[in-house]
Amino acid sequence: MRSRDEKRVARDGGSRGAMAALAPSAAALAPLPPPTRARHRRVTTRASPVSVRSTAATSSLVAPVPDSDFGRVVDGPALLSLPHAERRAVLREALERGSGLVLVPNLAGISPRTLVELSYAVGDVVEKNPGVAPEYLIPNVPEVQVIGNVRDERGALRAMFSRAPPLPTDRITGAPTLRYDPELRSPVWHTDQAFRDPPPFASLLYCVKSPPAGAGGDTAFADMTAACNALDTNRREELRKLRAVCSYAHHNAKVNRRTPTYPLLTPNQRAAHPPVSQRIIRADPDTNTESLYGFSSAVCAVIDEKDEVTPEDLDRYDLLGEEDASVRALMYDELLPFATGAEFTYRHSWTEGDLVVWDNLRTIHTATPFDERYDREMWRTTVAHETGGEAYLGASIG
């Protein structure tokens, strides 16, 4: 039996053993209205217990991640052999038991359409990526976005690419660490598309090509339900009164600083995607389980639930990529370093054929850098809430 400290090291160290200031050139728009408050309405993406009731056979396919309380493992070939209803039962059970993280190995060689079929086993609305550049999508399968550094025969990128910064080093051991460093603003822990109302329910990321062992390219995940539960009761009560103002334009402006090929929003796109405010502590509508939420490059301010952001400040956040001091004080200096401790994190080292599914409302994740002499190609799908399949212009990088 491993000690708790040994388990923490295993979770932070890898998973191969477990699974063999730029501003847009366009003139500023007319002042935008204050951000809309995300409604957190009850949704039906998670099917009722009756429609996905597990059986002994399906439950036997769900196993713990070794040395971790976070995540579950489902064998890929066994999952593919099941009919749709049983696939859904297995994946839904694994998501619930795994705190929103599921690892599915041994799927090398599946087609993009098979990935879409698996995505429909997670939820009923798989998005078709409206607005994403066609070269970043699988031809004739618009649900699948390509992420990585792969190029076409002309040498042009055929994948959405964002360069992850180096990992910080532990101040005691000197080893790379996943714990967020407020000074370096690294790793780039985030939840996807917090600027949407409602945010997407889940994401699937499938490994087509991966750098060899030791060359980087891992993806790490953190359990925001466990982190929320570990907070002091009084602090949780204070956080329930706060909201994160999330802006799509602000997000793209910040990512563009690090990766100039990342697209900025046009004035029309900005007008079509106004900011929203999200609760810092988000309650699951089905179980009432609470999770920390809102860690995203889209967050430009943290406000009391009774306050609003002025249109002038929104222009500054969206057009100049600036953020209010409240973001650093709460999200970067306090919550992220706490929530990305080893006891809450899992690091996945990819093998070709691996699939990872995560609940976007209960987890955060981060990419890690890799040796760009090697190809890295990932396929990604996004599962929306049935009420939230609205247009957006791209996915963040895993």
Q: For each of these PLM feature ranges, what is it?
A:
Residues 57-99, 103-357, 361-398:
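Fe(II)/2-oxoglutarate oxygenase catalytic core
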Residues 1-2, 17-38:
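N-terminal chloroplast transit peptides
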Residues 28, 35-42, 111, 119, ...:
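N-terminal processing/targeting junctions
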Residues 6, 24-25, 314:
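Generic early N-terminus positional signal peaking at residue ~5-7
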Residues 13-14, 112:
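Generic alpha-helix initiation/capping and coil-helix boundary signal
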Residues 21, 43-59:
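N-terminal mitochondrial targeting presequences
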